[in-house]
């Protein structure tokens, strides 16, 4: 790829500019202005790419890489795609995160020759730049999730970053200030397709993490692109304001992000930007903080491979509209933290849950509506078709019907919160009538085909279509008129490619033509040919009718679109209302279908889930005709930490995840998979469940685990929910136990937040003796001879052994390996020589892992009490050895 910092002289030298053809010089001039793009250069019926662009595109598109002559001594690599198949190929390029410049011909070859002679080069220029963050076409973007372009600015103090993000396809724009430590987490929430960054951040850790952890496309701009004075002027000009305070109370960093996004849109869309509302200022703390690892671990909107199957979203998404799907996606990505707003959403869900008949009707009607948000954007950017206007018309019609459903049932007694949602569903009959009167039901997608405007809307349109559809009848009518005038019954009107339409009369009847309006054109052996002004006019009308009607229809269509754009604010409110109806009806439908319950919220540290289930796992089991084993979770101010032990495959990780997911579902306004749920609002959720070596970043499993754990301890607050699974397992046993122990102490004593902590280190269960807010729980199992049965129930108590060999057998290890493992285990149980270490004690509330001071005056009592608690048959080899060391240390 061409180096972006190459100057013009270097560029021309590299590509032999001075000896290139005029056409290739034109290409190179345009390419130099778009070095960061793949340039698609229109050549007749093809878009062609040259040099490095051709090499890249041929691989991505799977098309042949050929050559187009030589430039000096160098052959020019080239590939091309048919212009009519452009969209299909663009989809592939966009998927690979390429930035594409479309260079079109601005005149025909004939027009070029008329201006500059037969060697003239057709005028060309870039008409549009397509980037992952600026796409609006439905073929290129997912219909059920947003497509954000973001701009990120980090001020000098680096304490707070500013972030602006816009979805061009729906004309939504937001701005937020984000603590520096939360930048990656906020980007993970938004999942922008493209991020604008200053060049001075190119080599920063932030840019490296955005690329490696999130894999988002970064578009770098020169530092001056984000200059505050320049950006402020851009904002004022765009919104036609005199004072930046018209935006609201925004920081200088936010001014830079908004201005840079508007400038980038202007550059890529060639000034053709849709009307964007004033940016909505977002309070970062109004949403639950969920970090990158937690989003991945919980599989909230995507699964661990980046797909949708098996995610929480795929399980609870039964929306029936595209905009409803996007709103649900946004809800799940951004759970609320304001208890008032959460309860408002839950009340709406409860209303629909209590009215299943209304839900059923509304969902059927919602299936008829279109994605008018994106329709409207295409209209404002002059990339629409008649189908977009028809979609708006049908949606307006259906919205009126939907509003009627509510009043049929409730009359004027609707709750205020429902009245507020459905208010925009009516009130624009004028717009409906306009589209109904103008746009044909069979309007084609392509404006150049004509046939968009109803004939009765404009007399000239009717006249031209009459000519197109009934041209033969008009010719026959004129022929009959001339036969009557001349008395020549054999008179014909014919056509050839030389003289066009003409009147044909046999030679013997030529003397009957006396009227001077008949103009002689040609004489042959057997006939004489004439024309008239009337016939020439008819011919001209027939020849030009198609062109004229298309031109007229385009003008009328543009005028109709302008009238629609005037109503854009109303249409956006309508789209929001319909999407909210879809989401809340979806919540009600899912709650009824899957037996979910309305959660109750408090301002304390309650987390009381009765018979909770994992929504995704439950549905997967149901498909196999199996039942999910529900479990309770009862965290509170006085029992904040559950330490959960038990073998692998018993269900610990599922239990951890399901409770985090229940909190998220509850705080988006959804009912939850449980018999009852009482939750103190969670401000942040952190999970560390499993880890893999991050080879790209050169990090081991243990380093990745420690980094995640460190971030959790640094960012959690008293109102957070922490989910930890097997902390410390990536290192030696004693190091691992020590780390897990101290992490638990820190959470208990310093953070004082709710935590579910799963571990294989049974030594940690003794901490319940001196950490009053920590309680032990385990997974119930049933031993059947040498086999075990996982019951998946969470019960009070601690696991007495790991059952690792049983799990290994279930995993399919060879029988010889299992038998040998059992022999070794038996030997360890009899004569263990594994070194132990005493880290178990219960002697005081001031216990510290590294400060064991036994009280010698109570040794006898302690030994007696200790021996009474020992069951030799239930001790693992490791536990037995550690017990010996403990007893030795006590005496």
UniProtKB/Swiss-Prot annotation:
Keywords: ATP-binding, DNA damage, DNA repair, DNA-binding, Nucleotide-binding. SUPFAM superfamilies: DNA repair protein MutS, domain I, DNA repair protein MutS, domain II, DNA repair protein MutS, domain III, P-loop containing nucleoside triphosphate hydrolases. InterPro entries: DNA_mismatch_repair_MutS (IPR005748), DNA_mismatch_repair_MutS-lik_N (IPR007695), DNA_mismatch_repair_MutS/MSH (IPR017261), DNA_mismatch_repair_MutS_C (IPR000432), DNA_mismatch_repair_MutS_clamp (IPR007861), DNA_mismatch_repair_MutS_core (IPR007696), DNA_mismatch_repair_MutS_N (IPR016151), DNA_mismatch_repair_MutS_sf (IPR036187). GO terms for biological process: mismatch repair. One of its GO terms (molecular function) is ATP binding. ATP binds at residues 646-653. SMART domains: MUTSac (SM00534), MUTSd (SM00533). PANTHER family: DNA MISMATCH REPAIR PROTEIN MSH1, MITOCHONDRIAL, DNA MISMATCH REPAIR PROTEIN MUTS FAMILY MEMBER. HAMAP family: MutS. This is DNA mismatch repair protein MutS. It comes from Rickettsia canadensis (strain McKiel). The gene is mutS.
